[in-house]
Design a protein with these regions (language model features):
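A conserved beta-strand element that flanks and buttresses the S-adenosyl-L-methionine
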Residues: 143-147
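Conserved class I S-adenosyl-L-methionine
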Residues: 71-80
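Class I SAM-dependent methyltransferase SAM/SAH-binding core
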Residues: 81-131
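A short acidic, Gly/Pro-enriched loop at the edge of an enzyme's catalytic core
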Residues: 133-142
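A short glycine-rich, Lys/Arg-flanked "PGG" loop and its adjoining helix->strand segment in the class I
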Residues: 158-171
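Conserved beta-strand signature within the Rossmann-like core of class I S-adenosyl-L-methionine
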Residues: 172-179
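Class I SAM-dependent methyltransferase Rossmann-like catalytic core
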Residues: 37-62
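Core SAM-dependent methyltransferase catalytic element
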Residues: 226-249
Length: 249
């Protein structure tokens, strides 16, 4: 190969790399890399209690699956004490915004809200089937972690809730749900007793609201779980599913 040919090939390679990089930068759906999520989890000001929770939640994989980016606007449904709300606050940074929906605000959430990292968070104390004000829409991401099953025994209109979540998202926005797995035949009947819900039951309810199923993740699956015990006293690690849905463009 001549020097001229080598030079021409090198220029073509540089051009291809440059174009690919430009496309990646321009693509607003490109996720933060997993390495960045690991750095978020390792931040020194996170509490020891949250680090204990990390051991069963696998937050690096969970955040990677969401694809959350700096500057995104996120709603964390069933936020509870704010573990996942804080993770999202760290992901989206000061240019982003996180809303944490709770049916009633827990003392642990109030304490957490005093942390500087939560300055970009607003707590919404609202029923799950009316989770956001009517003027809040165009969100990039909704998360709903280990609390959907609770709505099965709380008198929540889940069809209304799911439609409200759909309306709050921008076209192309994502919904990521994780929950404790029940046997298929148990459906929603063990939400209160075992704190579980059948994966296909949940998926069907979400799709009925207009969401398109995108992907599932396996990093919290435990096939050795018989799924016949309450999750807090399960004899094995709890089998949990993680699902991603999208609002069509």
């Amino acid at each position: 190969m001549t020097f001229a040919a080598v030079g021409h090939l090198a220029l073509r390679t540089v051009a291809v790399v440059a174009i690919s990089l430009a496309i990646l930068i321009a693509n607003d759906t490109a996720p933060v890399c997993a390495q960045d999520y690991a750095a978020i989890i390792a931040q020194a000001d996170r509490s020891e209690a949250d680090r204990v929770t990390d051991k069963r939640r696998d937050p690096v994989n969970l955040l990677t699956f969401t694809g959350a980016k700096t500057g995104w606007r996120v709603l964390d449904m069933g936020a509870g004490a704010g573990y996942s709300t804080e993770l999202m606050a760290r992901c989206v940074g000061p240019t982003g915004k996180v809303y944490g929906q709770v049916d009633e605000e827990a003392e642990k959430m109030r304490i957490r809200m005093a942390m500087p990292v939560m300055n970009n968070v607003t707590v919404l104390v609202r029923r799950s089937d009316d989770p956001v004000p009517s003027d809040l829409h165009g969100l990039d991401l909704l998360t709903f972690y280990f609390a959907y099953h609770d709505t099965t025994y709380m008198g929540i209109d889940r069809a209304k809730m799911n439609k409200a979540m759909f309306a709050a998202l921008k076209p192309g926005g994502f919904l990521v749900i994780a929950d404790h797995s029940a046997r298929p035949e148990d459906g929603t009947t063990v939400g209160k007793t075992y704190h579980r819900i059948a994966e296909q039951t949940l998926r069907s309810e979400i799709e009925a609201a207009g969401f398109k199923f995108v992907a599932d993740a396996q990093f919290l699956r435990h096939p050795e779980d018989a799924r016949t015990s309450i999750v807090f006293r399960n004899p094995t690690p709890v089998d949990e599913f993680v699902l991603k849905f999208q609002k069509p463009m």
